Amino acid sequence: MSRKYFGTDGIRGRVGQFPITPDFMLKLGWAAGMAFRKQGHCRVLVGKDTRISGYMFESALEAGLSAAGADVMLLGPMPTPAIAYLTRTFHAEAGIVISASHNPHDDNGIKFFSGSGTKLPDEVELMIEELLDQPMTVVESGKLGKVSRINDAAGRYIEFCKSSVPSSTNFEGLKIVVDCAHGATYKVAPSVFRELGAEVTVLHASPDGLNINENCGSTHIESLQAAVLVGHADLGIAFDGDGDRVLMVDHTGAIVDGDELLYIIGRDLHDRNKLQGGVVGTLMSNLGLELAFKELDIPFVRAKVGDRYVMAELLEREWLLGGENSGHVVCCNHTTTGDAIIAALQVLMALKRKGETLAQARQGVRKCPQVLINVRFEAGKSDPLQNPLVKEASDKATEAMAGRGRVLLRKSGTEPLVRVMVEGDDENQVRGHAEALAKLVAEVCA
């Protein structure tokens, strides 16, 4: 059954445009509360990132959940993975995150976590969608949900992050720059690294509700690169607005992406005989990562793009490590979802054990030239990927690379974009095919 509201990562869109409106969020809170109540007594945690609209939607969700008889525990601004962790430790039926991740402030969205801290099963999402189409009813007054606030949420999560590395860990002498993207990590990330002994310079940790992800964080890494070079830091760490993505910068200012971080963590686990199986990447993972793991005899498989698909593959195979080149890294030996702070800590521990710099560790991945071009299209128009001209051009580009590259065309699960990715061993050829395909897709979308 197809979904009406839920995308690959919850519900997301422009604030004020359906479904990202206060009245829809009220109904969504009620529908979610009714769905979770079917499993017995219902307690739901609600957290958010730092967008100004988060306060409005928090109030609407709170009212809807209460109307359904669900107790609500408010966390305030907290990273998405923190909400997953706290949902689990408070034994709540579900967790709700109000965030649009790496998108600008005028977008927002909703993600759900199950009581075990994982993404909701498909059947629960479909149940919520069915309830959204039913009239809203309010439970009798004596059964209305109560609302409370968890005041020590940040401290609990900081201690959890620190527990992901050995208790003897001391990063004294390590000089790092941390970019919090004016987002949900601003209260917790600097404390985690400082309490473990690192010297920390903090960038973009003054959210005003409007500046989240604005020319900062993992999607705009230039200021972090500059700060690392100017401050002669050992490395830089960039988070996105909700704290589930991480990219790094080495001491030379070079960007270290999710593929390379996955390699560094995977190699460390492999060296210590703690990998448990192989590593899960995605269709967008660079071919160089696959080849690097092959050299280490580490199995590597590709899931569909999206951390929920990476997680599903990990659970099915009972493996521990997976991620995306965008910086979602899932360490199942520590977390139930992508956690940027914990992933960064695993990289720092791997470097410490090996006695390497980040620049040295990343050399294990010889990345193939890869070009990604995003083409915007209007929702409701015919699917450009089903156009025979686009299919023919994609097939011809693949054939022209004669087994030395690959072409991937896909629609984003969170934005109205077609992503055109071409990868191969000849950079000029790769760029030429990518630009030609992107131009054709744009013409078809016009």
Swiss-Prot record:
Active-site residues, record numbering mapped to chain: S101 (phosphoserine intermediate)
Catalytic reaction annotation: alpha-D-glucosamine 1-phosphate = D-glucosamine 6-phosphate
Gene Ontology CC: cytosol
Post-translational modification: Activated by phosphorylation.
Phosphoserine modified-residue sites: S101
EC assignment: 5.4.2.10
Keywords: Isomerase, Magnesium, Metal-binding, Phosphoprotein
GO annotation terms (biological process): carbohydrate metabolic process; peptidoglycan biosynthetic process; UDP-N-acetylglucosamine biosynthetic process
KW Phosphoprotein (keyword) present: yes
UniProt: Mg(2+) binding residues: S101, D240, D242, D244
InterPro entries: A-D-PHexomutase_a/b/a-I, A-D-PHexomutase_a/b/a-I/II/III, A-D-PHexomutase_a/b/a-II, A-D-PHexomutase_a/b/a-III, A-D-PHexomutase_C, A-D-PHexomutase_C_sf, A-D-PHexomutase_CS, Alpha-D-phosphohexomutase_SF
Details of cofactor binding: Binds 1 Mg(2+) ion per subunit.
Cofactor or coenzyme needed: Mg(2+)
GO molecular function terms noted in the UniProt entry: magnesium ion binding; phosphoglucosamine mutase activity; phosphomannomutase activity
CDD domains, per the entry: GlmM
Pfam families: PGM_PMM_I, PGM_PMM_II, PGM_PMM_III, PGM_PMM_IV
NCBIfam families linked to this entry: glmM, PRK10887.1
Similarity remark: Belongs to the phosphohexose mutase family.
HAMAP family hit by this protein: GlmM_B
Role of this protein: Catalyzes the conversion of glucosamine-6-phosphate to glucosamine-1-phosphate.
Name assigned to this protein: Phosphoglucosamine mutase
